[in-house]
């Protein structure tokens, strides 16, 4: 399925790598294999890819028309490898079958059955049961708080170089579900909480007069920032699904603007980093930050 197409990209960018370790509990492969899922209109697909690469660097596959869901559908697809993360970009020419489009990322796992067993044991629901595609198997799971992710497995292991910086999944959850989500994801990912700030500055979510709880997690799947809010969020906060780390925010924002992106918020400093919100062609919104925790 969606993120599973990363192995197709391996045909463009790399030869097959070593076999993947398989254990009952440790199923992550590496953050360079975790693809952000970006849904745009077919007319915006190439514009988005060009803009993203001009901003961050990287390479993209050629456009392919294919079916990536277990029910009939058709999409154009391109895969981006960049120093700050990998992306699967879809421009559907048919209606998108439910629940596709609501999953935020695809995580490559070493063993699909073990991964689903670990996810359900940790408290996730399997909302799309495994189905075959030409290169492996795919499924979608839902965590406490309604957070949806794809898991995918390759018949032949791909091999991508490590990322320069690891992107952050930005997860917005309610106070009622935050602890349940964190417990479940930590049990599944075997990750750790690197910071839990009960009074993070509200400027990070567009509410400078307030505070909120911010939890940072790291695991073999990559980084994650959990933003625990009351849902009183001004646009565009809550619409972004990923944060990208760069060495020079000012220079990166200049590149983004020149490549057709819109800078939605002025850079702010909080939590040891400078950050801004950016909208790329096709309405893909991302947080971009430098330095910090």
Language-model-derived ranges and their functions:
Residues 17-21:
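Sec/Tat signal peptide C-region and signal peptidase I cleavage site
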